[in-house]
Amino acid sequence: MYKPIYIFIGLRYLWNPYLPNFKKIIIILSILGIGIGISSTIITISIMNGFQNKFKNDILSFIPHIIITNKNRNINKLNFPKETLKLKNVEEITDFISKKVIIENKNEINIGEIIGINIKNEKNLENYNIKKFLHTLHSRKYNAIIGSELAKKMHVNINDQIKLIVLPISKKKFLQNDLNIKLFKITGIFSTNSEIDEYQILINKKNALNFLNYNKNYITGWKIKLKDPFILNIQKIKKLNKNFIILDWKTKKGELFKAMKIEKYIMLFFFILILLVSSFNIVISLTMNVLDKKNNISIFQSQGLSRYKIMLIFIILGSTISIVGNSFGTIISIILIFQKDFLNFLIKIFFIDIEIPIEISLIQILTINITFIFLTILSTLYPIWYAIKSTPSRILSDE
């Protein structure tokens, strides 16, 4: 005697040599439906993770996650908001010098942003890959390192000169033509493959203070680098710093951030649809089995098998289909993800010629699998309830 009996019967109902071909096809299609749903969900989420990680590395690693400043963008270092130190998720707080300027060359004019940097603090400049140019940014000469795209726009190269113009804040000074103008020699060009290549100009911090006419101990503000820039409670920071202007990366990248949120909602919608289709497959498969096995169910009941164990038979049947489908889909998705070249080749056939970043999250894969299995098992409840609601005498009398 096979024990436990309900597991043996459930697995026999799933697959045995005497099962009609039509039922085998239904079971195979149910497993394939779940597998395709799982694999498409995992691949899509992995691609979204890749884009999010690329966004974090290519853009958020070069811009401040939070900026604390005032209306004039000119603030005394001694007024540092100490309440900020109480915040969690903060990796680093540093002061900075920054200003938008007009860039002028012989025949070109553009808008850029100067960043005053401390050449002794190389840690914050690692992503720029400018180690070989960094020594040129000493305070004795007005030198600059500019982005590669900006250099192309201005048609300049190393050793060329550019004129930087700072517009005054007040209209009176503007009408009096009281402008800060300085010639800078280009001593390096950086390329980060991000948008900062189009506008950033790195100059020595002391030169930036002199060029912008900042008083002693005055700065533009403080920039905060977060451990995870996607975990951001800007309202809490504003409450702690009521006398300052608080700007976060979402303000600067608002449209892009909204697009990412919309993508997540669309992904959630498709995830729910796939769940519904998978559950529907299980319901159809189990309902057909229940209708076919009505006589068997009545015989089991008349032989003393409890309704609870009859329920377990069909739970075993439904959960096995779900687990096999989930395992199949997960394996296929992981194989495709690791074959990045093949996946990129498929995407390039149907879409444009772009490189798709992919990042696997084992926790997300586990969560997807558990959710699918749990909900598909829940979907077995209706066929099971249908199976046990009738009495054995009524079923057998109908035959």
Swiss-Prot record:
Disulfide bonds: none annotated. Part of an ATP-dependent transport system responsible for the release of lipoproteins targeted to the outer membrane from the inner membrane. Such a release is dependent of the sorting-signal (absence of an Asp at position 2 of the mature lipoprotein) and of LolA. One of its GO terms (biological process) is lipoprotein localization to outer membrane. It comes from Buchnera aphidicola subsp. Schizaphis graminum (strain Sg). InterPro entries: ABC3_permease_C, Lipoprotein-release_system, MacB_PCD. Belongs to the ABC-4 integral membrane protein family. LolC/E subfamily. Pfam families: FtsX (PF02687), MacB_PCD (PF12704). It is found in: Cell membrane. This is Lipoprotein-releasing system transmembrane protein LolC. The chain crosses the membrane at residues 25-45, 266-286, 312-332, 358-378. The keyword Lipoprotein does not apply. Coiled coil: none annotated. The keyword Zinc-finger does not apply. PANTHER family: LIPOPROTEIN-RELEASING SYSTEM TRANSMEMBRANE PROTEIN LOLE. One of its GO terms (cellular component) is plasma membrane protein complex. It is a multi-pass membrane protein. Keywords: Cell membrane, Membrane, Transmembrane, Transmembrane helix, Transport.
